[in-house]
Design a protein with these regions (language model features):
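Acidic, proline/glycine-enriched N-terminal capping motif
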Residues: 1-100, 105-107, 249
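Residues forming anionic-ligand binding surfaces in small-molecule and nucleic-acid pockets
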Residues: 50-62, 108-118, 152-153, 203-216
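Internal amphipathic helical hairpin motif
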Residues: 72-106, 139, 167-203
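Well-ordered mid-protein domain cores that form the structural environment of catalytic cofactors
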Residues: 88-118, 122-138
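Internal alpha/beta scaffold segment
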Residues: 126-153, 217-218, 222-250
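The conserved catalytic core of RNA pseudouridine synthases
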Residues: 189-225
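Conserved small/polar residues in nucleotide/adenosyl-binding loops
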Residues: 254-261
Length: 263
């Protein structure tokens, strides 16, 4: 037998309590689907996808790789490693990017958020977080040694959840009322930072309007220590809107139905 570590999101036990069937994604355990009664996997993921399309759904995205890219030359660095340009990305905006290996094959894809002039928040796919970090460190240490850029793996520091569906904005307007959720104020690929108030606790969060399924959707990240609390808080709102939690099978299904790129 070969020993291998297992990584779990901050909301792992809540997924089990909700009846999730878990699956492996890289080193992580992620919810595969949430069956009701005697549902098969096909029954469950089709229901989850349909509910998300009709009302609202929430999925755990904590396992995505997360890398802080900081420094005076961070923009130049990102503009070199992605095949699409990042030089004109303004503060408060996110952009989807594709990264290639030295042989021209795709290494990874994901979104990068510009939080400040010299501060970016990069997300990677779950399985490629390590290889992407290694690739970028190699570039800085052996090829572009003149660039003033600092990389930090912050995957374990942030709990992430995506809220998708036609009622996603309505839900978040109630859950995080400090923000203006209108299309004018919160356009596609916009990035905001706010505070979630749960009882006497104030929790800082970063939110981007990003869709992986073709529906209106938002990604929300909070400190990992508050992940379980925020997940339960938002799950209660999901239930009020007749929505559901959904797993990776529904993610893949809705992603393909939306004709989105899959790496």
């Amino acid at each position: 037998a070969h020993w291998a570590p297992t990584r779990r999101s901050p909301m792992h036990h809540q997924h089990l309590a909700a009846g999730a069937v878990m699956t492996d994604a890289g080193l992580w355990k992620r919810p595969w689907y949430y069956p009701h009664a005697a549902e098969t996997i096909d029954d469950a993921y089709i229901r989850e996808a349909a509910t998300t399309r009709q009302t609202v759904g929430m999925v755990d995205v904590s396992t995505l790789g997360k890398i802080a890219v900081q420094g005076p030359d961070a923009t130049t660095f990102l503009n070199r490693i992605y095949i699409n340009g990042f030089a004109k990305l303004t503060v408060g905006r996110a952009r989807y990017g594709v990264m290639l290996r030295d042989d021209g094959m795709v290494l990874d894809d994901g979104t990068t958020w510009r939080l400040e002039d010299d501060d970016y928040f990069m997300t990677t796919t779950t399985a490629q977080a390590g290889p992407v970090m290694q690739f970028m460190e190699e570039l800085l240490q052996t090829r572009w040694t003149d660039l003033r850029v600092h990389l930090s793996s912050v995957t374990d520091l942030w709990a992430g959840m995506a809220i998708a569906g036609p009622l996603a904005r309505n839900l978040l307007a109630q859950a995080v009322p400090d923000l203006d959720w209108s299309d004018e104020a919160f356009s596609f690929m916009a990035v905001k930072q706010s505070t979630i108030h749960i009882a006497d606790t104030e929790i800082e969060c970063r939110i981007a309007r990003i869709s992986f399924s073709g529906e209106r959707a938002f990604e929300l990240y909070v400190n990992a220590d508050h992940g379980a609390m925020v997940w339960q808080y938002l799950a209660d709102f999901v239930a009020r809107f007749d929505g559901c939690l959904y797993g990776m099978e529904a993610v893949s299904y809705t992603h393909l139905r939306a004709h989105e790129t899959t790496v």
